[in-house]
C-alpha cells in the first residue's frame, strides 16, 4: 500500500508539471464556421431597460421567422421567437453559458466577459478583461447610434461567430471570434454593463450541451 501511495504521488507530480497533460482551454475545443446570416446580435434590455445584455438569436429552420430586423441605423430587432414555442426552429443564447470570447486558438471565456455598454452616443459590445486589468478592452460590435429596446449590434471588422466543437462534434455554444488580437483596443470603461446570467437556460433549444 505504501508503494502504491508513493507511485501515485509521483504520478500526480508528473501530471502537474507535464505540458502534455495540462490542456489549455483553447486546445480542448476547436471551432467550426456558421452561416452568419442566420444570426443576429442584440442589445437586449434587462428589467425596466436601464441596463442591457448581449443576446444572440439563431434561425435554424425556415419554418417561421425567429426575429425581424428593422431598417435604418441603429436597427430595432423584433424578437419574434419570444411569441411561440421555437424548439427546433430557433436558438437563443442569452449569457456566458451560451457564448464566450475566443481569439485564434485561445478560449478566453474565463478571462474576458462580453458586456453591453451605452455610451450615450452609441451602444457598444465590449470584451472586458476579468482577471488582468492591464489586458486590453476590445470593441466587438456597435449599434451605430443611441437607441433603446432590442437593438442590433453589428460586428466590427475582423470579428465573426463560430461554433464550439469537440472532435468532430459541434456543440451548443457560440464563440464571438477573431483570428488575432486587434491592434487598437478601446479605452477602459468606467461602468460596463455585465452580461451576467439572467435566465435559467443559455440556449433555448434541444441542442447538445456545450460542455
Cite the ranges covered by each PLM segment:
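C-terminal segment of classical bacterial N-terminal signal peptides
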Residues: 14-23
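Structured domain cores in non-transmembrane regions
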Residues: 58-124
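Extracellular/luminal recognition modules and glycoprotein regions
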Residues: 23-81, 145-187, 207-209
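Bacterial N-terminal signal peptides that target proteins for export
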Residues: 1-8
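Low-complexity intrinsically disordered segments
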Residues: 98-194, 199, 203-211
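Intrinsic-disorder/low-complexity peptide segments enriched for small residues
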Residues: 10-12, 205
Amino acid at each position: 500500500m505504501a508503494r502504491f501511495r508513493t507511485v501515485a504521488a509521483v504520478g500526480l507530480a508528473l501530471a502537474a508539471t507535464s505540458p502534455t497533460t495540462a490542456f489549455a482551454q483553447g486546445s480542448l475545443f476547436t471551432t467550426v464556421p456558421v452561416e452568419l446570416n442566420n444570426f443576429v446580435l442584440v442589445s437586449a434590455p434587462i428589467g425596466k431597460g436601464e441596463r442591457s445584455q448581449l443576446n444572440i438569436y439563431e434561425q435554424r429552420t425556415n419554418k417561421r421567422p425567429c426575429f425581424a430586423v428593422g431598417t435604418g441605423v441603429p436597427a430595432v430587432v423584433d424578437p419574434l421567437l419570444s411569441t411561440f414555442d421555437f424548439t427546433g426552429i430557433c436558438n437563443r443564447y442569452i449569457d456566458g453559458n451560451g457564448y464566450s470570447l475566443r481569439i485564434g486558438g485561445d478560449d478566453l471565456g474565463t478571462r474576458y466577459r462580453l458586456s453591453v455598454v451605452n455610451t450615450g452616443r452609441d451602444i457598444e459590445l465590449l470584451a472586458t478583461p476579468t482577471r488582468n486589468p492591464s489586458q486590453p478592452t476590445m470593441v466587438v460590435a456597435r449599434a451605430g447610434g443611441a437607441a433603446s429596446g432590442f437593438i442590433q449590434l453589428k460586428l466590427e471588422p475582423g470579428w465573426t461567430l463560430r461554433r464550439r466543437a469537440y472532435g468532430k462534434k459541434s456543440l451548443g455554444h457560440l464563440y464571438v471570434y477573431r483570428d488575432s488580437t486587434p491592434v487598437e483596443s478601446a479605452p477602459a470603461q468606467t461602468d460596463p454593463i455585465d452580461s451576467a446570467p439572467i435566465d435559467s437556460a443559455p440556449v433555448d433549444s434541444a441542442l447538445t450541451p456545450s460542455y
